[in-house]
Amino acid sequence: VQDSKRKEEILRKEGDMSYDVYAEVCKKTLEDDFTFQSFKLNPDYTYELEHTPFESAVNALQFLRENYLDELKKINWNIIRANDTCVYAMTHSFKKQLSDIIESEDENQFMFSPTTIYYLWTAFNVINKIKSSNDIDTKNGCSIVEIGCGYGGQCFMIHTVAQFYEVNIKSYSLIDIFYANKLQE
């Protein structure tokens, strides 16, 4: 309810001020450690990023299971989880979807943000498109440009999956508003 009220506030003003609000959150995140640690929970940030619904992540995992089950069993889930543990994130248990993939009794091993799961889904799709393309030299390296990348979570996930598949990424350009780009540093 609080998030929807904040969205109405942002959009009710003259024009769409969402980028101004988002830029201000990114700027404050760079200036203060507490704000940095919790920026993924800030409604003014999650209006733009980190707002993947749980149901979308469940659907993404279902697709990944149907298409990449063997790979999911081999990938290092601690690296995937790092996207949610370097700063606070709204995580959910995906134990029901991952209990036959991640071998653990520890409930924390199944905790991921829906956005991280969605980034993983996107990364598998991107890297497999690159691998199957006859126009891209995956051994000598490919170049990727991401526009609207926020703190760089998708970039992190694409690099993780690329390493798993031994796809060489020669360059990865991240383009966003000034303060969002500074978050990546």
Model-derived segments and their meaning:
Residues 181-182:
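Short alpha-helix immediately C-terminal to the canonical SAM-binding loop
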Residues 122, 141, 158:
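P-loop NTPase catalytic core of nucleic-acid-dependent motor ATPases
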Residues 152-166:
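Conserved SAM-binding loop of SAM-dependent methyltransferases across substrates and taxa
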Residues 1-5:
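Intrinsically disordered, low-structural-confidence terminal and linker regions
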Residues 140-150:
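Conserved class I S-adenosyl-L-methionine
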Residues 171-177:
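Conserved SAM-binding motif I beta-strand of class I
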Residues 185:
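S-adenosyl-L-methionine
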